[in-house]
């Protein structure tokens, strides 16, 4: 027979032109690799220390007690096997986790009291259980308390150093105040900033600012050291007046600095006396060049030019130690009336014979005096004072001591336990400041702080650029593993404190590590993270695409991230570095826009947490197949061509100028300059956007809505892949885990709806049974109440290869994503029923279940142990008629298959009531007749209002030691039978394989001895084996020793595998039979699953893939729908006005292409019917060639056997599927060509007739096939009605919302409307008896019951509340009746 393997994949006609050299990476790799690194960090191979669990333990341990007589060290950790597998955890509401076992070593020392020397006294090692560590499932999710959750990756500011300014907002003058911030991975932030007076300040953790020199003093620098670190020194030598020369200062000349300026004095060469340039003349670049060529020149400056300069070093009298000037002092001079020097620092220096003065090289143009001015303004002069100041800022109100201040300052930035830059932070800091510290240096150094301040000062001097904090080189991704690591570290640190106290409080010689450890804080931290962290989210399981997108999310929110209110426009905006890393399209609408993003299709996260995107290398104008991944920072240095640049066969660029990206800008560049090219046109969008065909023809806003709405598409009863796809569909279905892939090649042994059994033929290991059993999930409920249902695609005897789709899941069709249906649509107005984007649908859709979906709701009830006695699940409920119990079995639980409606009992339950005191008569009666039944009340689980459906599954959970009822036992029996069936099948295949191998081993060999009736010396053949049962084959001893050994080994392997199978079976049965872990106080729990079939109806929301959404307005009989000239009625009618203003033209192109696809399919169908009549294959081949185009046909189908080709033709009778990748899809010419081949007009329009009158519409109408989705906004879930119901406690007004069974709010505007109409009585009724007049509403109810129609309104409760509130303000309000007044 033909193998199904070839006929399986529906072959798509591919319209892309660009060859893709790189396979798309696995879509959930981000999640899996990150968590894997976290869990397996203790493995020997290839992991650095300091990562994952290993890193956390190494950073917290060893723990010493307070007087250091004992140390608790970490040796290694190990994750044991999880107790329950994924499926069991889901059905039992457990967390899928593995016990974490840590080996700890306790070392006790003997301390010599006199010398203080330590010697080891005792070493104890022990394995300690440290709580459970949640494991990730195959699909990158976590099962927490039975529900699937996803941990979203977080984008945060990368650790490192950032330079910025306030954009002129702080000071009224609009002056730019520069700032620099050092952000560690954990620890205190350090900021440096300028103020309006150009002084430099430092802040620690955003507290009060201190002069930056205070910080430098605290680092152990003195004034001279500080000046030396930030400024160059220039020597001024005094030249006395003489030989016609005025007195002046000789100093070195820097020609570069005066370029383009006009000096205010003559520039004189000190050696020769020649004037280089006259005062007021411009210094030309040519002159500067000439001077530079001459080498060093000394200038003679006028005498007064030294005034206002600053001394560079302390100037001291060597003999007496007298200080004339300190580093940073300003050189001043005072003159008397005669112009003689009478005072100032200069006089002091000259009087003491100091004529060679070292001066700071500050010229107020290229170099500013900011640090020197700050030092002058700083009141501190010493390290101690500086430390005290820092202490006062960090711990206000505490009296500082030098020791405490010094310890605090050291622990802030230089203690690796408190401060961690992380490897990323160190690498970023080295890059920004040109340092070369190794990335193991994770704390700050003095050099780093000086380099930061120097960088900040240079910015103020106009050198360098500020950083762009939205650049993806400055934002990094924290994935699951890292988030979990941080959380676990918090838990361990909490635990560390407890361990320290315990080590000091016990007799350390007698305890084991186990006694010191309480693992609760660590386990609690993990639980808290998965349960309540903002980044751990309930997985969006609406369809496979929404699952994949959820795992590829990048959120800027969450702990350590931004908040919605604080995030400005810049953070949310698209940045050039997002190209190929983050999707510019897919982000939510609303207040989270731009804060939650999606990873682009080819992007990956590198070891430092930066997002990388792949490029192909271009060498000398030729594109190679070598792929390199680049982060945003690395990419800045390259010139990158776009993927759609035209290339010739050899891979050379055709055009001379190519459109490229360079450092974030787009420009045309010559071919020689290009060194990289994009890998694929779809690398800049995310998965959801890459699923939109003709995305390039849609406006971005609508594409955004299209991406978001595809995630809300409900899985339909019959999934159907789109005719017009993009080629991404199979990838999403594969990576989401919705469809089942074969783990290894083999032959299908058994198939039914529940499971697929494959006999493996590849990858067989020794001791491998060679059986793969795939259990299919049938009608399981997803997180969003949609259905998860898997269907087999293979037949018994089919050959499958590794990675082939063997079963479809929800919203997949033949292994392709299928979230909607292909329907015939027309764009035309129809009696106003498509006003405001409404959609008109044909009754055919209702009749043929085109858009029908199944939804499963879960209801649960628990029987608890109350103070008054246990609750009971039973059929025996007081005051309930037999009619209401018709669906319950004898245990009081609803049957599977029962159809239920609102108010029906699902599980009968009674609760004991409090005893009321009994009269003597009652006591007597009770003594005579025994128990009375009225001391229990009915607390049964009933279906809520508005819910209908069929019971599809019931699960009963019993506490350990509680007797099981009949229903529980029946469910248990079914489960055990299923397990036994699995075991038997696996055993059967195992036996078949083993006996086949045994037979091949002994066939044709000579027998030495055997069972009764077999003579020695016989040769093994079919006849001989036929006389024996298979079990007796083992008893044949063959002469060949090697064979005998192999047979023995095979026998042992067979026994071992049988044993393993039995053990596994017993283990599972044991788990099924034992009781369940229920919450405290719960004796028994029942879960009931109700499935409901929802057909498409008026009020349901539908959408296309291009953001064209609308609500169904009317279901029209088929005969009234517009129809085509061949009698085909249209399925949906869209409003044509929805296209031009929204600019999503992609939907029109899709409609045309889909129409062509359907037409070509019909032609293939006609050819197949011909073939069935006369057996001629030629028309079929011609139709396929016409349908797929000559080139594609020649590549794919030309040499195919007839039978296989027929299978393919049969698969595309409804329409030839095509794929048109985004930005590289079918062009207008392709669409015209396809329409022509299908026999349609290239306008894409058809003559349409009115179904009601039969008349032709006035002009041709665009009709075609479009892929339409039904979204998860169903009118059944939203609509609800209330007659009477719950009221709010305080105001006594009805509650609001469907969940509370609330009413409609009558707000102030509605009141105005009624006032405007003068409807006084209606208004009074609305505000009193229909709302919160308690007495009035009971009266109304009574009168309605009695059939009367008189009532009167009282005082609304909210008025009483108002009176009480006014009294709360101390004002007494009393109400007077009108009669009392008189």
UniProtKB/Swiss-Prot annotation:
Cellular component GO terms, alphabetical: DNA-directed RNA polymerase complex
Catalytic reactions on record: RNA(n) + a ribonucleoside 5'-triphosphate = RNA(n+1) + diphosphate
EC number in record: 2.7.7.6
InterPro entries: DNA-dir_RNA_pol_bsu_ext_1_sf, DNA-dir_RNA_pol_bsu_external_1, DNA-dir_RNA_pol_su2, DNA-dir_RNAP_su2_dom, DNA-dir_RNAP_su2_hyb_sf, RNA_pol_bsu_bac, RNA_pol_bsu_CS, RNA_pol_bsu_protrusion
Any one GO MF annotation of this record: DNA-directed RNA polymerase activity
GO biological processes: DNA-templated transcription
This protein's UniProt keywords: DNA-directed RNA polymerase, Nucleotidyltransferase, Transcription, Transferase
PROSITE patterns in alphabetical order: RNA_POL_BETA
One Pfam family hit: RNA_pol_Rpb2_6
Keyword Cell division among record annotations: no
CDD domains xref list: RNA_pol_B_RPB2 (cd00653)
The UniProt record lists the keyword Nucleotidyltransferase: yes
Matching PANTHER family: DNA-DIRECTED RNA POLYMERASE I SUBUNIT 2
Record family assignment: Belongs to the RNA polymerase beta chain family.
Subunit structure, interactors included: The RNAP catalytic core consists of 2 alpha, 1 beta, 1 beta' and 1 omega subunit. When a sigma factor is associated with the core the holoenzyme is formed, which can initiate transcription.
Function of the molecule: DNA-dependent RNA polymerase catalyzes the transcription of DNA into RNA using the four ribonucleoside triphosphates as substrates.
Protein name, UniProt field: DNA-directed RNA polymerase subunit beta
Gene name of the record: rpoB
